[in-house]
UniProtKB/Swiss-Prot annotation:
Family per record: Belongs to the SspH family.
Annotated Gene Ontology cellular component terms: endospore-forming forespore
Species for this entry: Bacillus cereus (strain ATCC 14579 / DSM 31 / CCUG 7414 / JCM 2152 / NBRC 15305 / NCIMB 9373 / NCTC 2599 / NRRL B-3711)
Name of protein: Small, acid-soluble spore protein H 2
InterPro entries cross-referenced by the UniProt entry: SASP_SspH
NCBIfam families to which the protein is assigned, alphabetical: SASP_H (TIGR02861)
Name of the coding gene: sspH2
Amino acid sequence: MNIQRAKELSVSAEQANVSFQGMPVMIQHVDESNETARIYEVKNPERELTVPVNSLEEI
């Protein structure tokens, strides 16, 4: 996924179909300077991760 699309999905009111390593996630924040995204698992919202934006897939 590219940074612009990740930013669009992070501010969208709709639930996006995004996955990280096969697990459904939500994007909380995108850090353009580091090209990373703060995400959390849909099934486990307390598990937050910072991952490279290019590791996210829109499904």
